[in-house]
Amino acid sequence: QQLTIDIDSFVFQMKAFSGGYTHANSYYTGEIMRNVHSYDITSSYPTVMIAEQYPVTRFCDCATRDLDMLDDQYCWIIDITFTDIYSLFENNYLSLSKSIDRYHALTDNGRVVKADSIRYILTDVDMDVIKKCYRWGGYIINRVQRAEKGYLDKKLIEKILELYNGKTKFKGLADFENEYLHAKQGINSVYGMCVTNLITDGVLYTDSNGWTIEPLTSEAAQE
């Protein structure tokens, strides 16, 4: 109950969520590249879940309107409008589809290269990346919420470690392929469960009408 939020805060916080970064370098899009190399961070999601800190209290609105005042003692969600923003690199972090509003935005396959004005709802993690990848002429903070940060519950961390141990123990062993797949699916689902939106429109199928959508009301969402 201490973490329960109202529907307004829920909608606000959901807009801050975004998926992983997958994007082609615009200089090489459409070309066949040979003799390339790559690497992968093994079990990156579960590693971050046990090593980093997350919101452990309810997010609350605060009056801060200065980016320099967003200290790392808290988790932050920021509704911010940038003006005269531009990317420093060929690979661009900000996604146009996640912006709330924009004016004269130049994009590279959906990623923002520059814009006269663009508005987002971001986390403090996003802001750390954006500060490294972009420069801007000015900004206006429209709304800010903050929560105290801490490590995830010990029981959850222990479960993640248990699943990771099972995954690595069975990996590459032909006689334990099913056990490996089960452990891998389990550890992958931990993150997925944390970011699944449970408050959605209803979907109903009947033989007479086929598929229909039952829009979620604010009252039902709050319940």
PLM regions and their residue ranges:
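Conserved acidic
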Residues: Q1-E223
